[in-house]
Regions:
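N-terminal assembly/interaction segments in proteins that build large macromolecular machines
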Residues: 2-330
């Protein structure tokens, strides 16, 4: 039977599939609209299955708030071209709208939702069939609290944040802190909120670095005292190449090797434990200042911390939780 352009357009409007795909589906279904939709749905599942091992690194992340609940989702695809497609963004928007309306608290609850009469997973699979790209709902998070502010970075859909304040009526301050979260990627609210394994790891690294710095200074001073430029002998490759260039003599190269070995050993044996501990504490404190939200320098006034900024507005104002999604490598 002949398939009309009106039928093709109707199927395309319902499925967002390409014109030729719609025509082929209607022809195969002998003009039956429901059967054609089922054919396209199965085709979408086949396309999605074939692309399941591909890397979906682009996409759309969105955050939204409704009262005392806020959520964010990450819908992934393969290319920036598809990520910016209006239909793809519309699908992500429908998903976040449904998530917030249902106030989901787990990915299982999200996957159980329906949009436009179909399961979210099926909606994503069908869209994958239309675009020919792998798609997946790769992230979900939520917060609850007294007052929540969402930030979607310049409506570009690759970065978003949620911030929970302990008091209502400070949306502008919340927006500023949400931008802080998006820009500075804190790992915790404050030092007390940093996971213990992270604290232990940072402390170990700081102690090791403090020891190496002190040993390095001792070796550098000994080299300078011997009339050797430390930069010329900071590695075995440099010693060999700089000897070949004539920048240091073979005798200086041998002397440098001897100094580096003996002085480093002596310096390590004579390290002062209390001094190393104090230096390490300073390094860890710097880590907290750079990575804990309330201790970070506020992006709009780096002379004060985020905590100080909030207290300058209201003495009791603080952040109780935050979340962040980004599609960019950091």
């Amino acid at each position: 039977m002949a398939i009309t352009i009106q039928e093709i357009n109707e199927l395309r409007k319902k499925t967002q599939a390409g014109l030729m795909d719609c025509k082929k589906a209607l022809t195969e279904a002998n003009g039956d609209m429901e059967a054609a939709m089922e054919i396209l749905r199965k085709k979408g599942q086949l396309v999605a299955a074939k692309r399941s091992d591909r890397d979906a690194a682009e996409g759309c992340v969105l955050a939204k708030v409704d009262g005392n609940y806020g959520a964010m989702i990450a819908l992934k695809c393969e290319t920036d071209f598809v990520a910016k497609n209006a239909d793809f963004v519309a699908l992500a928007t429908k998903i976040i709208d449904a998530v917030v309306a249902a106030k989901c608290k787990s990915m299982d609850e999200v996957n159980a939702l329906t949009i436009d009469g179909e399961n979210i997973k099926d909606a994503i699979t069908n869209r994958s069939g239309v675009t020919g790209e792998k798609m997946e709902l790769d992230g979900f998070n939520f917060v609850e609290g007294e007052d929540i502010v969402a930030y979607n970075h310049m409506n570009q859909n690759f970065l978003c944040a949620l911030v929970v304040l302990n008091k209502k009526g400070f949306e502008e301050a919340g927006k500023g802190v949400a931008m802080q979260v998006a820009a500075m990627s804190p790992i915790a609210l404050d030092a007390d909120s940093v996971p213990q394994d992270v604290k232990d790891s940072e402390t170990r690294n700081a102690v090791d670095k403090a020891k190496q710095n002190q040993i390095g200074k001792a070796v550098e001073n000994a080299l300078k005292k011997a009339g050797i430029n430390p930069a010329h002998v900071d590695s075995e490759d440099h010693i060999e190449s700089n000897t070949a260039k004539g920048w240091i003599t073979p005798e200086e190269a041998a002397k440098a090797r001897e100094i580096k070995a003996t002085v480093a050993k002596e310096a390590e044996a004579n390290l002062k434990e209390q001094m190393i501990e104090n230096i390490a504490k300073g390094m860890v404190a710097k880590f907290y200042k750079e990575n804990c939200l309330l201790e970070q320098a506020y992006i709009d006034d780096n002379k004060i911390s985020v905590a100080q900024y909030l207290k300058s507005i209201d003495k009791d104002l603080t952040v109780t939780d935050f979340k962040r999604f980004t599609l960019r490598a950091e």
